[in-house]
UniProtKB/Swiss-Prot annotation:
Name this protein carries in UniProt: Probable nucleolar GTP-binding protein 1
Single GO cellular component term: nucleolus
UniProt subcellular location: Nucleus, Nucleolus
Sequence ranges of Basic residues compositional bias: 570-580
Keyword Metal-binding annotated: no
GO BP annotations, alphabetical order: ribosomal large subunit biogenesis; rRNA processing
Gene3D superfamilies assigned: 1.20.120.1190, P-loop containing nucleotide triphosphate hydrolases
Entry-linked Pfam families: NOG1, NOG1_N, NOGCT
Keywords carried by this UniProt record: GTP-binding, Nucleotide-binding, Nucleus, Ribosome biogenesis
Length: 674
């Protein structure tokens, strides 16, 4: 269980932001309008409320900041020393102390100015006292800028610290830089620590978790330690020293016997002896890493004696230390190191709990009661003989049913045929006699019955299923298939020749016209200026060729084109008669015609969008069919347009001062509008 959650500490604002937060809150939460005509008591209350509220806001905000940060005397020594190493305990305490002093000074300031405000005799004097009190409070907070900035940096770093439980089962990895601590941790856990071929890749503590005997174990990877005095060690190394000093865990001291880390075995052994005091009263394992590069038997004799001295109390080592070879590359020995370390720590923790006074207080309450025999007489359970006999008979019946074979009709027939044979009388059952079955084979030659064949199925083998004329049958099938394909080809030729010459020419003309229409459609889609359909002129040549393709006579074609031209002239919408046209060219319209044209002009004014009559080649029979197609097209686009989203071309003028944010009632109830 993790004891501390530093991520809950709220953000510490800068001094300027602090002042803005408090003053804006005071402006929002207190009345803002006062007049000199009001009674002096009301004026004093108005300004005293502002001073009180500002001081209270400062007090609450500072109290929350001071309370969120942990007190070094109240937390676990491991975290207290870690904060001291990372942030300097003196600087940390001074910053919190300055905020506490500022809080007390603000409280005293508010008391002094409230006392003066009680005797204010005018609005101007009360306002100046309020202004002076708030100004002194803000000046006081401006001076706390460096402390607030430092505490915000501490908060950010504390939130990024790993969640280490100092009281749980822990494996602690230590040793020189680049000896394989992070690689070993990645093998044990899923922490995914960064591994690089240079020293001091790990610059802080990393935590992973693994399972052993249905329990969760905490694995801590510490930065590398160098062999020099304590006061010369930097912040990175001091994190490892802090973890070794305060966490009760099983320590795994890793030694690179291949010396590829850049340090000799003698230097690594010297480091062990220099920090030996941190290993006392803790389970200890010395892990000989990188045996894939150099086997333990290849280590020089002098270096091997130095390694063995780590577990020899006579030569300054620690008794009970285990020496285990291991390789992170080949994973040789990793499971053994894990099992040994967890088992040693588990036994040590159990033994420690049994020695505690709490166990002694509780263990006398446990009592194991065992019955004692009153005499030497054997009192076995009494089971009636009938029950025993029935159980035996049931077992025999079950066994006989299990051994009884299931016989088919052919087997029964075989038994009946050989029932009088001597072998059957001797106990040889014919259904299990292979030769008895071979006698029943149906073969052309009886000598073949006892041949050794790979498979027997109801008295037949593979040769019985092979047709001797198989090649001849294959040739017949191929000839039949060729005849079928030839017949299909002839049928296709017959279908193609169903049309006579005139129809074939018409079919070719239709195909050519389709191709021409397709090309014209592609040309229309090209990016060239186009005229609207309502103002486009009539192409008489195209219309004449179209009518000719529909087998119209030349006289009919001329009449149709003239009628269409006259009709299109009469359908020009909204076009006024030009000034140059003489009134004598056309007869004066009658009153009925004038009324009809007036009604038509009104109806045309109402319709904002009109559909032009279908042009030749559009594929519409008449205007009604085109209108119906246009309506279906709009209906199909409606659902797609509903899913439209705002794009770069859309423009929107925002309301920069929305009224619902800049007007409204006040909490005091003095105004209906701001």
């Amino acid at each position: 269980m993790v004891l501390y959650n530093f991520k809950k500490i709220q953000v510490v604002p800068t001094s300027k932001d602090f002042i803005d937060i408090v003053l804006s809150k005071t402006q929002r939460k207190t009345p803002t309008e006062i007049h000199k005509q009001y009674a002096i008591g009301r004026i004093r209350t108005f300004y005293m409320r502002k001073v009180k509220y500002t001081a209270q806001s400062y007090h609450e905000k500072l109290t929350q900041i001071i309370g969120d940060f942990p007190l070094l005397d109240d937390i676990h020594p491991f975290y207290a020393d870690l904060i001291n190493v990372l942030y300097d305990k003196d600087h940390y305490k001074l910053a919190l102390g300055q905020l506490n002093t500022a809080r007390n000074l603000i409280d005293n300031l508010s008391k002094d100015y409230l006392r003066l405000l009680k005797y204010g005799d005018s609005l101007y004097r009360c306002k100046q006292l309020k202004r002076a009190s708030l100004g002194r409070m803000c000046t006081l907070m401006l001076k706390q800028g460096p402390s607030l900035q430092y505490l915000e940096q501490v908060r950010q770093h504390l939130a990024r610290l790993p969640s280490i439980d100092p009281n749980t089962r822990t494996l602690l990895l230590t040793g020189y830089p680049n000896v394989g601590k992070s690689s070993f941790m990645n093998k044990l856990t899923r922490a995914n620590v960064d591994v690089q071929p240079y020293a001091f890749t790990t610059k802080s503590l990393f935590v992973g978790h693994t399972d052993f005997k249905y329990n969760t174990w905490q694995v801590i990877d510490t930065p590398g330690i160098l062999d020099h005095p304590l006061d010369e060690r930097n912040t990175i190394e001091m994190q490892s020293i802090t973890a070794l000093a305060h966490l009760h865990s099983c320590v795994l001291f890793l030694i690179d016997i291949s010396e590829r880390c850049g340090y000799t075995i003698k230097q690594q052994v010297d480091l062990f002896f220099s920090i030996k005091a941190l290993f006392l009263n803790k389970p200890l394992l010395v892990v000989l890493n990188k045996i894939d590069a150099r086997r333990p038997e290849d280590v020089p004799e002098d270096d091997w004696k130095l390694i063995q001295s780590l577990a020899d109390p006579a030569r300054g080592g620690i008794g009970g230390t285990h020496l285990i070879p291991m390789s992170n590359l080949t994973e040789e020995g990793i499971a053994k190191v894990k099992d040994t370390a967890c088992s040693i720590l588990f036994e040590e923790r159990v033994e420690k709990k049994l020695k505690s006074t709490r166990i002694e207080k509780e263990i006398h309450r446990l009592h194991l009661a065992q019955p004692q025999a009153r005499d030497k007489k054997v009192r076995a359970p009494c089971i009636p003989e009938s029950v025993i006999a029935a159980a035996r008979q049931a077992d025999m019946d079950e066994e006989s049913d299990y051994k009884k074979p299931t016989l088919t009709a052919a087997m029964m027939e075989m038994i009946e045929e050989h029932e009088n044979d001597e072998k059957y009388a001797q106990g040889i059952i014919p259904i299990y006699d292979v030769n008895a079955w071979k006698k029943k084979y149906l073969l052309k030659n009886d000598e073949w019955k006892f041949d050794i064949v790979p498979e027997i199925i109801n008295g037949q083998n593979i040769a019985d299923f092979v047709d001797p004329d198989i090649l001849k049958r294959l040739e017949e099938l191929e000839m039949e298939e060729e005849a079928f394909l030839e017949e299909l080809k002839n049928a296709e030729d017959d279908e193609e020749s169903d049309l006579d010459e005139e129809n074939e020419a018409l079919y070719d003309e239709i195909q050519e016209k389709k191709h021409e229409l397709r090309i014209n459609h592609q040309i229309k889609d090209s990016s060239k200026p186009q005229l609207s359909k309502g103002r486009r002129g009539i192409d008489t040549k195209e219309m004449a060729s179209h009518l000719k393709s529909m087998h119209h006579e030349d006289d009919e074609i001329g009449d149709i084109i003239q009628s269409v031209r006259d009709h299109s002239k009469s359908r020009i919408s909204g076009k006024k008669r030009s000034r140059s046209a003489s009134r004598s060219d056309s007869q004066a319209p009658t009153s009925e015609e004038r009324g009809l044209s007036l009604n038509r002009s009104k109806s045309r004014q109402r319709s904002t969008t009109r559909i032009a009559s279908p042009a030749p080649g559009e594929g519409f029979h008449d205007l009604a069919q085109k209108e119906k197609a246009d309506k279906l097209d709009k209906r199909s686009r409606k659902k797609r347009n509903q899913d439209g989203r705002k794009g770069e071309s859309d423009r929107h003028v925002y309301n920069l001062m929305p009224k619902h944010l800049f007007s409204g009632k006040r909490s005091g109830g003095t105004n209906d509008f701001r």
